[in-house]
């Protein structure tokens, strides 16, 4: 036991710890007295180089007088804490409170590069092509629903709209003329409406006919006639048929005259 105590007592004569807490948490290099102006000058030199590069690039894109020349741009540091900078000609002397804001605004007003402008133009062209394609598809659908003459070339958009207006007016006139003929007591309104295809007569037209020399054309007519009255009957009717006219001939009406038309045969589905 005494031997053990003697060994423990010998620890008191052990030298100080291998490292001090201050040495462990503190860098020896930081103990050296450094001048704050040295750090400030290094930062100012770094910023001056960056801004000189920026103004050198901006001078190529801009020719305005409000941009400083990169060669005449200089920084000066002082112990007052400010960061004044000035141009060689004295035209860009700014107060310390407006330095950062002015630089940011000039960066925002910088012109886009050629690559960015090319991308914007390509995107605008794609949007315009899609818009025109949608318009062309809509006109193709409209042409497919309007009875037209066998033109040598496709109708233009203006002619297509004129034909559509004439056809809609014709259908509206047919509906309005048929309303007084309806019997309110009959149930013909509940019957399905049918579109009947009408053809010109098979007789040879005379030279006095307005359609002499033209091929027979198909028109469209609407019928709400009660089919019960037409059972077991061979009915031949004539009706006003809308014949598509050339929209480029403005002196002609899109409505055909019933007196000048040959008899029309209505093929009724009995």
Curated annotation (Swiss-Prot):
Key word Transcription present: yes
InterPro entries xrefs: bHLH_dom, E-box_TF_Regulators, HLH_DNA-bd_sf
Alphabetized CDD domains for the sequence: bHLH_TS_PTF1A (cd11417)
Record SMART domains: HLH (SM00353)
GO biological process, one term: developmental process
Cell compartment(s), UniProt: Nucleus
Keyword set, alphabetical order: DNA-binding, Nucleus, Transcription, Transcription regulation
Primary subcellular site in the record, as a coarse category: nucleus
Domain bHLH: 119-171
This protein's GO CC annotations: cytoplasm; nucleus; transcription regulator complex
GO molecular function: DNA binding; DNA-binding transcription factor activity, RNA polymerase II-specific; protein dimerization activity; RNA polymerase II transcription regulatory region sequence-specific DNA binding
UniProt function note: Transcription factor implicated in the cell fate determination in various organs. Binds to the E-box consensus sequence 5'-CANNTG-3'. Acts together with pdx1 to induce the pancreatic lineage within the endoderm. Plays a central role in directing the differentiation of retinal progenitors towards horizontal and amacrine fates.
Name the UniProt record assigns to this protein: Pancreas transcription factor 1 subunit alpha
Protein source organism: Xenopus laevis (African clawed frog)
Taxonomic lineage of the native organism: Eukaryota, Metazoa, Chordata, Craniata, Vertebrata
């Amino acid at each position: 036991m005494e031997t053990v105590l003697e060994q423990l007592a010998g620890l008191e004569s052990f030298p100080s710890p291998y490292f001090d807490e201050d040495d462990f948490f503190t860098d020896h290099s930081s103990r050296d007295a450094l001048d704050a102006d040295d750090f400030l000058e290094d930062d100012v030199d770094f910023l001056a180089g960056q801004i000189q590069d920026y103004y050198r690039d901006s001078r190529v894109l801009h020719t305005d007088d409000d941009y400083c020349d990169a060669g005449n741009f200089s920084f000066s540091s002082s112990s007052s804490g400010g960061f004044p900078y000035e141009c060689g000609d004295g035209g860009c002397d700014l107060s310390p409170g407006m330095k950062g804001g002015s630089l940011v605004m000039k960066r925002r007003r910088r012109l886009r590069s050629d690559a960015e402008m090319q991308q914007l133009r390509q995107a605008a062209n794609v949007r315009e092509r899609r818009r025109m394609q949608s318009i062309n598809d809509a006109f193709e659908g409209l042409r497919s629903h309007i009875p037209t003459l066998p033109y040598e070339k496709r109708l233009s958009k203006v002619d297509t709209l004129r034909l559509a207006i004439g056809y809609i007016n014709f259908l509206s006139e047919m509906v309005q003329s048929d309303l007084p003929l309806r019997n309110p007591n009959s149930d013909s309104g509940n019957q399905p409406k049918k579109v009947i295809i009408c053809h010109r007569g098979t007789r040879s037209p005379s030279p006095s006919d307005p359609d002499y020399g033209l091929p027979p054309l198909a028109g469209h007519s609407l019928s709400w006639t009660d089919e019960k009255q037409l059972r077991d009957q061979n009915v031949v009717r004539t009706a006003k048929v809308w014949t598509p006219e050339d929209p480029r001939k403005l002196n002609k009406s899109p409505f055909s005259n019933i007196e000048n038309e040959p008899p029309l045969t209505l093929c009724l589905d009995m």
